[in-house]
């Protein structure tokens, strides 16, 4: 009985072992089929698939090479090959995908060769190749790539060779980063041919001279808002510091600001008090700093900076009998002598030139009376000194400096320009221009043609009180202030030789625009008669970003 039970137990165990033995090769065969699909050819170290619609899902092993040819999947998704961490070579040729997503090759820390050739790729995400720090060879040849995202190769620290042939690159601003990268990389890169824009067609990207002009523009952004009204702004440098003097008639102040190199803004430095101050003009003579403070009431005065008091103190009065309604102060030099002129807009006013005599300023010449002058501008015309006076009662007149009498004498006028509020001069490429501001009608831009000033452009300017030219490096602008609508900034178009509209800014009742540069930054003060004074910063915008 026991023997029978023992025999049956041995027989059962034998049958169980035989059954298990029979099952082992079947399981191994199933696993082999799962590891190598019908569309693929597999060895211990490599897989080649033709016409596959998916990436083989194979248990991680020693697979070091994967080739997918004529595949039908439409994109390379993130971490699409992460289940094959031992890959050293990945070939993706003649497939249907059009896009490579971010982190498409994440997890392939040992990948050295990546060939993505002859596909239909149009888009590559910025972080598509992230993590491929051991990659030495990359080919994107013969795809439909028109542009590559900035820094797409930034993770490829070991890259030796890059092939970009056979694509359709648009060599516009989007290619600027690639242009710069090609100049700096130590990798060997195939020629990148441009199919556009037309001026670069069939050229090599490396042969493009520069993208600086096409791919940069400028802008004005609000940097600082000053909580007070103002009518004029002047700037001056003293002992390597930059200062700004702001006339505030409603607050009866001439506020002096200084540039704070730490906080990077303009802060209060000193305050000159007065009555209805309409102008603060700085004059630097040797190491001395003076400020002419023009007032509507109580006479105008000159202040001098006192080092011991570290503030401006009254230095001199300007005769009330000569200047009763100052409207503009203009500083100039002739034969190393310092002058300034005050334009008087009262009916019986005398626009007067003042001269420095080493002890103070004295009235040097009365220009004319009864004309209600609104502005004075010193201009060098063909090497000769001139003053242009604008007036509410006549066209702008031109006075020329007489070297014999050392006085200004009438020389001519600017015809057909009645009711001009202000005249400003500026130069571009050694050519002299004038901007003439009119409150009603069109303001004008004029050019000197060696004989006379001729009009080159009319700017609609209803309610304009100022048309101010200013420049930052090679960028030339006109700021047209308006009491009725947005103020306009115009930029000079070198090709058309005209000013074109560039930007609208909102400033309530603007009265002056002043350019100030410091710490390699450029600013633009906009005074406001009815609102807050604004400081705009002139910035360079890279269109390739």
Swiss-Prot record:
Glycosylation sites: 70, 186, 271, 402
Domain (LRRCT): residue spans on this chain: 167-217
One Gene Ontology term, aspect cellular component: extracellular region
UniProt-annotated location(s): Secreted
Taxonomic superkingdom: Eukaryota
Domain LRRNT: 29-65
LRR repeats: 86-107, 110-131, 134-155
Residue ranges of the TM segments: none
A Pfam family of this chain: LRR_8
Keywords on record: Glycoprotein, Leucine-rich repeat, Repeat, Secreted, Signal
Position of the signal peptide: 1-28
InterPro entries found in the cross-reference section: Cys-rich_flank_reg_C, EAR, EPTP, Leu-rich_rpt, Leu-rich_rpt_typical-subtyp, LGI_related, LRR_dom_sf
GO terms, biological process: inhibitory synapse assembly
EAR repeats: 219-261, 265-307, 311-358, 360-403, 407-450, 452-494, 498-540
Free-text tissue specificity from the UniProt record: Brain, heart and placenta.
SUPFAM superfamilies reported in the protein's UniProt record: L domain-like, Putative isomerase YbhE
Keyword check for Iron: no
Function: Required for the development of soma-targeting inhibitory GABAergic synapses made by parvalbumin-positive basket cells.
Name used for this protein in its record: Leucine-rich repeat LGI family member 2
